[in-house]
Amino acid sequence: MSGVRVAAVQMVSGEDVARNLERARVLIATAASGGARLVVLPEAFACYGSADVSALAGAERDPAGPLRSFLAATAREHGILLVGGTIPVAGEAPAERPRAACFLYAEDGSELARYDKIHLFDVDLPDVQRRYRESDSYAPGERLVCAPTACGMLGLGVCYDLRFPEMFRALGQRGMDVLALPSAFTRLTGEAHWHVLLRARAIENQVYVIAPDQGGRHSATRETWGGSVIIDPWGRVLASAASGEAVIAAEVDAAVLRDARERLPVRAHQRFYVPG
């Protein structure tokens, strides 16, 4: 890994799946034409809102489901690594809630990895929507995922996971060099915490962070923060977006990783290890 260009795609997805996929297609093409070899989509890129996730999830149990097929075909078309935000995937048992699955596809369209979102956003906030209950629709994942890529070891996380630093410490123990974190932070929490949490995860784990967010007004009661960002292992913001659709890009460089880790050899000094 040396000088690999990566991109984060910011969207304002709604409930119209066909429209969302078309916007994703255009934005991914923009990133690829700019030289990106790894492109990361935001959480819920294909459907964001009150649409029935169970109907989508049932179709995506099959690797040939429409959303998974879209991701595979798009990765293959552009010859890129593609992190597909999250899509709902039904469980094996009929009564089991779907998982919010984040897929990584290779340049040839093959599936390299799947991460199911572990930490579900069940909170009450003083905003227009007020009540968020992801666990009403989804079951939590159970397994950490870190996969070898041309960008180095790529760790996967999603949105609310960001608030649980022990998860990323465990990924660091598995050799993570780059973290992809598809997200849909609310405007309220994003304005307060988004950048500081992302910079903290980059600095404390000495990794690159690629964090695409949903960014805008989705409905009368839903607004996300935006502010998609790419951060280096020293905590420097290499690229950022405001609100609305955007594509941001930067270079992931092995020499920068090595320099940060040599300057502050915290991995060698670590005395406490997170189980798992």
Can you annotate each of these PLM segments?
Residues Q10-E15:
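Short polar catalytic/cofactor-binding loops
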Residues G84-T86, A100-L104, V145-A147, S228-I230, ...:
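Short beta-strand scaffold segments in enzyme catalytic cores
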Residues R19-T30, R163-R169:
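Short, acidic/polar
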Residues V17, V26-D116, F185-R201, N205-V207:
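Cys-nucleophile CN-hydrolase/nitrilase-fold catalytic domain and related Cys-dependent amidase chemistry
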Residues P63-V83, M153, C159-I248:
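CN hydrolase (nitrilase-like) catalytic-core segments centered on the catalytic cysteine
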